[in-house]
Structure formats: structure tokens, C-alpha cells
A protein has these predicted regions:
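Conserved Rossmann-fold NAD(P)-dependent oxidoreductase catalytic core, especially the SDR/UDP-sugar
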Residues: 102-152, 175
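Rossmann-fold NAD(P)-dependent oxidoreductase module
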Residues: 19, 23, 107, 163
């Protein structure tokens, strides 16, 4: 029996998301893309992509995003985040990056057909080390030292990363990647 897999992709209209869409389509995969309502970048998504409009800050939208045909399985790639170079605190930043990730994790846990959860974090979430010291894998992101995780974007990604690692330790098949720009 061949089980159909749907790739659930958040942040699909962003730079990384569109590139992931392109790669998956070239492999013949089915993609369900989570995009913000009215996002003008949606027009760049390949026509083969199934578009789901919603808000990561809505637990109901995240739950609905995971609803796929019975007998199918899914893989969630959570790329969406609010990005800023402003180092200051922002409630919206925390709501989207941390709260949105919590909503996605809750939905994934509620849907056993979700076989894998991949969270796209940031190298900014990794505590900075003195110059010349090699970066090593980190398995604890919270609590963080404010002088080593600089700016609230990086801190929000560190907090969300910890949520994913905690979910993985609790049994969710989840992993984290830390791309750099």
C-alpha cells in the first residue's frame, strides 16, 4: 500500500519556503502551503501548491492546516517567522515566532499522521561565543544569557527552538535546523 504524503509548509511565500516548494515539486511531492491572508508574495508560489490561508497566532488555523485526507501522512516544515533587525522587544515577534510555533507543535501532536516536524530556527538562536572559538551543537536554548543571544529576534528563535526540542523529548518526531543568511 502506497501512503500519500503531504508536505505542510509554513512560510511558503518567503525566500526559503518558495525554494523548498520548488525542490519538493521537482520530486513530485504534494505541498500544502500556509500563507498569511492577502500575502502578495503568494503569487510567486508554484501553481501546483495547495494554498491554505491563515494566521500562525490562531490555534484554530494551525489545527485546520493539519487536516489532510484520511489515510495520508504528513511532514511539517515550519519555516514561517517574523524577521526583524530591530533588536528591541516586540509582542508581535514573540506571538508569531514563539506562540505560532507552540500552535504548530500542538497541532502536530494532535495529528498522529504527522510523521515528522522540522523547525527552521536561526543561527542567531545559538549563543555567541568568543571570536575564534568553534560553534558546537547546542541542546539547551532556554534560559539564555542575554549577552550571548543578541536581540529579540534571536531570543524568540531560541525560545521557539527550545519548545521544539522539548516536544521532541516528549515523543514528537521533531528536529531543528539553523540556517544562516
Amino acid at each position: 500500500m502506497n501512503i500519500n504524503t503531504t508536505y505542510l509548509l509554513t512560510g511558503a511565500a518567503g525566500f526559503l519556503g518558495i525554494n523548498i516548494c520548488t525542490q519538493l515539486i521537482e520530486r513530485g511531492e504534494h505541498i500544502r502551503a500556509f500563507v498569511l491572508k492577502g500575502d502578495p508574495a503568494r503569487k510567486y508560489l508554484p501553481a501546483e501548491v495547495e494554498v491554505f490561508e491563515g494566521d500562525l497566532c490562531s490555534a484554530e488555523d494551525c489545527e485546520a492546516f493539519f487536516n489532510i485526507p484520511e489515510g495520508s501522512q504528513s511532514v511539517c516544515i515550519h519555516c514561517a517567522s517574523m524577521v526583524t533587525i530591530d533588536p528591541g522587544y516586540s509582542e508581535k515577534l514573540i506571538a508569531v515566532n514563539v506562540g505560532g510555533t507552540e500552535n504548530m507543535l500542538a497541532a502536530a501532536k494532535h495529528h498522529p499522521e504527522c510523521r515528522k516536524f522540522v523547525y527552521v530556527s536561526s543561527t542567531g538562536a545559538i549563543p555567541e561565543l568568543p571570536a575564534g572559538q568553534p560553534i558546537r551543537e547546542v541542546n539547551q536554548f532556554v534560559p539564555y544569557e542575554e549577552e550571548k543571544v543578541v536581540g529579540w529576534y534571536s531570543r524568540s528563535k531560541a525560545m521557539a527552538t527550545q519548545k521544539v526540542l522539548d516536544a521532541a523529548h516528549a515523543g514528537l518526531n521533531a528536529c531543528v535546523v539553523h540556517p544562516s543568511g
